[in-house]
Amino acid sequence: MSTPESKHFAIAIDGPAASGKSTVARLLAQRLGLVMVNSGAMYRAVTWKALGEHLDPHDSAAVANLLRHIRIECGHDGTRSTITIDGVDPSDELRSEQVNANVSAISAIPEVRDALIGLQRGYTQHSNVVMEGRDIGSVVFPDTPYKIYIDAAEEIRAARRKAAGEVDSIASRDAADSSRQTAPLVVAPGATRLDTSNLTIDGAVDAAIEILRHQGLKA
């Protein structure tokens, strides 16, 4: 259903930074008994590795060369996806200020996207997944019937970011994600919008499940 070779399906959850998509995707996966995959964590992991190697995140050739010499392994622990680079789990570093400031540049490199999209699609060879990101419904799984675009007002997203102790510019991140040439942030064809600005977490998850039911998911 997700790709011609897939044995399982994917629920695509897309949206801008701090829209609530990660929380909704995680709780959806728990409620439905599916594996949750945070595609953004993959890009953050590559960003973390590139910064650790003192590479310029805007030097696409250097970052592409790095990808050829590192081992990225993806899996899952129950309903949670996992990622290691050269055997190291970088989870604790993925939300650092440095990674926040540079992940958009890394994500815009075509070689990075090509490598990680292959890993993302690989999850459906073994599991039904809820995958969240910025191009899941438009690029990674364009044929899935289950697509939600989660959004919220910019000021609310900025407040959420601040409450989480993260320092970056929502406006700058939105501009970078929406204007990049490779897989920009868009509302995928067939996706239903969900505005979480005035919803509780449980309310957002309930709304997402209702959308998926309308899209044909038997949940």
How does the language model describe each region?
Residues I13:
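Hydrophobic anchor at the beta1->P-loop junction of P-loop NTPases
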Residues K21:
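Conserved lysine of the Walker
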Residues L27-S96:
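N-terminal phosphate/diphosphate-binding loop that engages ATP/GTP or pyrophosphate donors
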